Amino acid sequence: MRILIVGAGGVGTAAVAIAARRDFFEHIVVADYDPARVEHALAQVTGDPRFSGARVDASDVASIVALIREHGVTHVLNAVDPRFVMPIFDACYEAGVDYMDMAMSLSRPHPDKPFELPGEKLGDRQFEMAS
């Protein structure tokens, strides 16, 4: 298993610390828009060749797909703000890799009758694409 963790904040850094104690994966790439956050997350696993870092714009599907392909990633863990769920999900779908997250796409109200009809509910788009 080759994992891309998108987001090197609190959740991504915690995922690195937990994964470092395990042997279920071959490699983990920790990626964030801010290289300093990547360095901070990787500081706890210095010398472990199973970890590497990269810079990524989580709003750019093409750059996420390129990173997935460059590192032979098989699974992506989304550890960023929910606003970036859909670009990361779309990149995984395009690249044909598994997507893991602690959330789903944000709900949106009905465009014409927000108080009368349901709009797009949490996760609707992902479930629709998966069927």
Regions found by a protein language model. Give the residues of each.
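N-terminal Rossmann-fold NAD(P) dinucleotide-binding loop
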Residues: G12-A15
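Short beta-strand element of Class I
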Residues: E26-V29
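Glycine-/Pro-rich loop/turn segments that contact NAD(P) or position catalytic residues
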Residues: P82-S131
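Conserved N-terminal Rossmann-fold NAD(P)-binding element of oxidoreductases
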Residues: I3-G9
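Conserved Rossmann-fold cofactor-binding substructure of NAD(P)-dependent oxidoreductases
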Residues: R55-V73, V80, F84-I88
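Hydrophobic/aromatic anchor residues within beta-strands of the central parallel beta-sheet
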Residues: F51-G53
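Helix N-cap at the beta1-alpha1 junction of Rossmann-like dinucleotide-binding domains, i.e.
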Residues: Y33-R37
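Aromatic pocket-lining residues of Rossmann-like dinucleotide-binding sites
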Residues: A19
